[in-house]
Amino acid sequence: MRGSGPRGAGRRRTQGRGGGGDTPRVPASLAGCYSAPLKGPLWTCLLLCAALRTLLASPSNEVNLLDSRTVLGDLGWIAFPKNGWEEIGEVDENYAPIHTYQVCKVMEQNQNNWLLTSWISNEGASRIFIELKFTLRDCNSLPGGLGTCKETFNMYYFESDDENGRNIKDNQYIKIDTIAADESFTELDLGDRVMKLNTEVRDVGPLSKKGFYLAFQDVGACIALVSVRVYYKKCPSVVRHLAVFPDTITGADSSQLLEVSGSCVNHSVTDDPPKMHCSAEGEWLVPIGKCMCKAGYEEKNGTCQVCRPGFFKASPHSQTCSKCPPHSYTHEEASTSCVCEKDYFRRESDPPTMACTRPPSAPRNAISNVNETSVFLEWIPPADTGGGKDVSYYILCKKCNSHAGVCEECGGHVRYLPQQIGLKNTSVMMADPLAHTNYTFEIEAVNGVSDLSPGTRQYVSVNVTTNQAAPSPVTNVKKGKIAKNSISLSWQEPDRPNGIILEYEIKYFEKDQETSYTIIKSKETTITAEGLKPASVYVFQIRARTAAGYGVFSRRFEFETTPVFGASNDQSQIPIIGVSVTVGVILLAVMIGFLLSGSCCECGCGRASSLCAVAHPSLIWRCGYSKAKQDPEEEKMHFHNGHIKLPGVRTYIDPHTYEDPTQAVHEFGKEIEASCITIERVIGAGEFGEVCSGRLKLPGKRELPVATKTLKVGYTEKQRRDFLSEASIMGQFDHPNIIHLEGVVTKSKPVMIVTEYMENGSLDTFLKKNDGQFTVIQLVGMLRGIAAGMKYLSDMGYVHRDLAARNILINSNLVCKVSDFGLSRVLEDDPEAAYTTRGGKIPIRWTAPEAIAFRKFTSASDVWSYGIVMWEVVSYGERPYWEMTNQDVIKAVEEGYRLPSPMDCPAALYQLMLDCWQKDRNSRPKFDDIVNMLDKLIRNPSSLKTLVNASSRVSTLLAEHGSLGSGAYRSVGEWLEATKMGRYTEIFMENGYSSMDAVAQVTLE
């Protein structure tokens, strides 16, 4: 801070002892000093007291150049004139000298008393501070001195490189400031033994020479200079971010920041060059950069200490030493990595922090499934994965000669779906195996270190013998006669017919118009495609069919028709064209007459045959009741079960009324070529075979994700009918909340049903995995979708019979869709009273009581099941009635008990559940009513905030249906835990049901 003196003299005032509220009292032991006259002992005693009270330590960021309190010998200061400033030399209680100067020439005019210090080295500092501690007498307290007494004195300095250059004239000194006292003492202070000590600080800079002198000028004050301290400020040495910053003298300017570079401590390296800034006040500011302990060392208490054995640090960027990862060790200090144990490995690309692993053991329990066109393999992952998660599988196919006992690798004739190497799934399909061939498939589990292990391969073998397979592709196709409107082709049998060729299927289309193609079938190896455009390129593909099914199409062959010839040739075609037109007209007339005569009945023209019976009663005996293919876009009035259905009203048709299920499936479903489907992985097992996910790419359409159900090998005719019936049922439905049938594959093996793919799988499993993750509105949205789908089925006259959360599929957008339409159900007299299907038992806990007792399945019984589904959704997939037996469930429902409300269930939803569980089926709501109710709840979310209270849950908890005999359970809590209802214990206790006798009395009332 700049003062009034020249060359940057600064003024700082620090109110110390004697200033403000910090006025010390003179000790009683020194009270006698104040009774003496002003001169002599009194003044000396006073100065001693002041000196004894000011021996204080300096701050760590201040370096003293001079402190008169600590000088043991003579100060060497000079006073002139000699009768001016007077040195008082005393010692303290430790016999240390006390240097004090006083002057009190207040009665004489024109005082000019100087006190000069010895030469003071600045030690390289360009800015220094002077701290003065002094006392001053109040002029008003001195009788007779008002005209000559002053209450200030002056301080000067003079720079010099010479420590012996004290012969300085007064005018050569540079004034720093005029010093005034904040407080002065009076005679009263002496009487009260109070001493008022002033502290003033001034700064000077910038300095340019090695040292300087100070001078104090008295002009007529009564003053005692108790101590003089001269110092400079520095930023003290410090360790920050593992960098050492040395003592740094502050700059000359009070606002200057000096940038200082740090040096890294031992065993550390530079990350970003460490820097800090030293402020004028001696404080470190603005740290930049840092050092890091090098590899093998960690930071502790500002130093880098070595990593102990068993620990390592791979990089300076790591913070601390880490314990060696699993299956590795180190016995050295300062380790940067750990060594793998015997038989364990780490890849070069693996970081040192990764655990050492070993190759996995062999896969387990491999099984095979063989059909005419492929081999399916499935297995369980290895018991020992080697410690890693990167297990994949490699399939090695060997073709074996059973007589010679020799095996060779299969080569390229076998295709692996999805792949042979790097397989992540535990299943694979091999396509195009040879018929009647012995294969050995070696399934090897590998991971990232398998190549590093010198040990033997770990694999499981599966031996397979194929039966008759579909034919291999046709490879050799030759063109025959080519005209402007026709192309003749011939070809050879496939290299591997794998049986008797029944026929060939030829597919052709104009180039670049693949979506519009024509199919020709031929029992010979030659065909002629007619009706083609002149001068056009056509693409042909051929495949063969045996009893095992169709093979794959051949590669594409391109042939071009000849161009149209000249005018004469065109004229020659006129008679032919005329004949063709005439023949066409005749054929058209014959067909019209044929239809009008009612002969279509004899040809089995499908639903139109029932119209024939109306128009031509005499033909009824010939037509019978027949169902055949009809254009799905065509809407006609037809008979069904004795009722007339008007055009535009869709009604469910039971596919079992068809003599041939293939006819039904082709009427309601679309045939898809197997080559359009890519199987990716097995996702489950259905009633009739495996369920897989894959991709469907139809010509001219975008690729779709699909799910496929396959008909297992060795199926019976009844199984085939039931399998196709499910597709026939599904194909009749078109609703966003009903699973969509994409098509069927019936012309090749395996027979497949292709549906849309639902990413999240079954609803019950999905809810269990995401327990508590959805809002009430989201749950109601799911229920609304299910209800909308069931309303659609009800409107079509279809009764589902097995509505449960497990039969609801949910996609990635949380859209729920009703599925599982293919089960036939038979009521058996088993102790569980469950419906048995070929896929297993369906528990009766979802089934309405009238359906259990009288086999009355209606839309109303589906509504009961829907209420159970609501309970499953709100409880996030809990099992209805928990662990109660089916007989207990039947008894409880018949006696009027119902499932309790799930926890935190909105009252409106639980009331809807109870409505669905009305014993009288006519009292239950229709699905149309349910959809409307849920729509209202969604539009008014506040109506869902009212929850079912605790006491109402107790009344529906099926108390007496858990063997409540007094000896069965010792406490209510034990009974609730046994029935999987332990979370309701607190509710029972709060409502007074603390004993088994009390629980046994629970009724609906």
UniProtKB/Swiss-Prot annotation:
**Which residue spans belong to the Extracellular compartment?**
27-575
Transmembrane domains' residue ranges: 576-596
Q: Which residues carry this modification: Phosphotyrosine?
A: Y652, Y658, Y835, Y984
Q: Which UniProt keywords apply?
A: ATP-binding, Cell membrane, Cell projection, Glycoprotein, Kinase, Membrane, Neurogenesis, Nucleotide-binding, Phosphoprotein, Receptor, Repeat, Signal, Transferase, Transmembrane, Transmembrane helix, Tyrosine-protein kinase
Start and end residues of each Eph LBD domain: 62-240
List the signal peptide residues: 1-26
What's a single GO CC term here? rough endoplasmic reticulum
Annotated Protein kinase domain residues: 677-938
Write out the annotated subcellular location. Answer: Cell membrane; Cell projection, Axon; Cell projection, Dendrite
Biological process according to GO: axon guidance; cellular response to follicle-stimulating hormone stimulus; cellular response to forskolin; dendritic spine morphogenesis; ephrin receptor signaling pathway; hippocampus development; negative regulation of cell adhesion; neuron development
Chief location of this protein? membrane
Q: Which domain of life is it from?
A: Eukaryota
Coiled coil, from the record: none
Q: Where is the SAM domain?
A: 967-1005
The reply on keyword Glycoprotein is yes
What this protein catalyses is: L-tyrosyl-[protein] + ATP = O-phospho-L-tyrosyl-[protein] + ADP + H(+)
Q: For the Fibronectin type-III domain, which residue ranges apply?
A: 359-469, 470-564
Gene Ontology terms for molecular function = ATP binding; ephrin receptor activity; GPI-linked ephrin receptor activity; growth factor binding; transmembrane-ephrin receptor activity
Please state the Enzyme Commission number of this protein.
2.7.10.1
Quaternary context:
Heterotetramer upon binding of the ligand. The heterotetramer is composed of an ephrin dimer and a receptor dimer. Oligomerization is probably required to induce biological responses. Interacts (via SAM domain) with SAMD5 (via SAM domain).
Name this protein carries in UniProt: Ephrin type-A receptor 5
Source organism of the structure:
Rattus norvegicus (Rat)
